[in-house]
Amino acid sequence: MSVIRRLAAVLRQSDSGISAFLVTAPRKYKVYKIPKRTTGFRVIAQPAKGLKDIQRAFVQLYNFPVHDASMAYMKGKGIRDNAAAHAGNQYLLKADLEDFFNSITPAIFWRCIEMSSALTPQFEPQDKFFIEKILFWQPIKHRKTKLILSVGAPSSPVISNFCMYEFDNRIHAACNKLEITYTRYADDLTFSCNIPNVLKAVPSTIEALLKDLFGSELRLNHSKTVFSSKAHNRHVTGVTINNEETLSLGRDRKRFIKHLINQYKYGLLDNEDKAYLTGLLAFASHIEPGFITRMNEKYSLELMGRLRGQR
């Protein structure tokens, strides 16, 4: 059955209606920018509601393989699991893929379909046109530019994880031979081990594999390649691994949370800051529950419960 027919059945629309809608789908995005944590902006391209519905239906209809080393956008996994995988190792390497989502094109997607070593959906030639319209965004509406994966589409996390499957599979196998632990959280690659100097050769291995699989489309962001060890603070996707091999919020974040709780205690936070603090406390409870226990003891269960919206 064709992709259009399956989507039409699930969405209770006509084949012709969906086909006509998809012709201009890559231009049906609202674009805005949000500041990055350090410098610059991240471009978010959010699809129109009708296109979102089609994208969600597509990734529910077709099961794309995702490697076990992938920690982002997966039910039951998250940044805590990503950091915990490396907690018992002394030496750490962090690497970053440059402009990750926007570097994934239809050509990469189809190449990954062809070369996947896992069970992967197969499509009829006539489906190709519409699948590209469903999944990819055209950044400049009035000029014929190449299609790319957008940050903001509900299908993009699934497709990005799938497109990295073969990379994850091969780098994981290579790491296993060297007793290196490997995980990937979206564009963040993390490697760790207990053998000195083994990680030094990993960046060149990553680059060679990226070139082999994706040509020059996916690249390392060399400014974000960081080596660290137990002698220094080790941070993995925002989580600190301390020398006792347990996960921590880190000293600075704890100090900041305590400051905000104190501000709240004396009525000095506005509603926006309260909501932000509530989110920080939920994160803290997930990463380091003992810290929340200590805050309950210091500031009282009543105040902390009120802050978290429990009463």
Curated annotation (Swiss-Prot):
NCBIfam families: retron_St85_RT
EC number: 2.7.7.49
Domain Reverse transcriptase: 15-241
Keyword Magnesium found: yes
UniProt name for this protein: Retron Ec78 reverse transcriptase
Binding site for Mg(2+): D96, D187, D188
Keywords: Antiviral defense, Magnesium, Metal-binding, Nucleotidyltransferase, RNA-binding, RNA-directed DNA polymerase, Transferase
Function: Reverse transcriptase (RT) component of antiviral defense system retron Ec78, composed of a non-coding RNA (ncRNA), this reverse transcriptase (RT), a probable ATPase and a putative HNH endonuclease. Expression of retron Ec78 confers protection against bacteriophage T5. At multiplicity of infection (MOI) of 0.02 cultures slow growth when infected with T5 but do not collapse, at MOI 2 cultures enter growth stasis. Responsible for synthesis of msDNA-Ec78 (a linear ssDNA with a 5'-terminal phosphate residue). Unlike most known msDNAs the mature product does not have an RNA component.
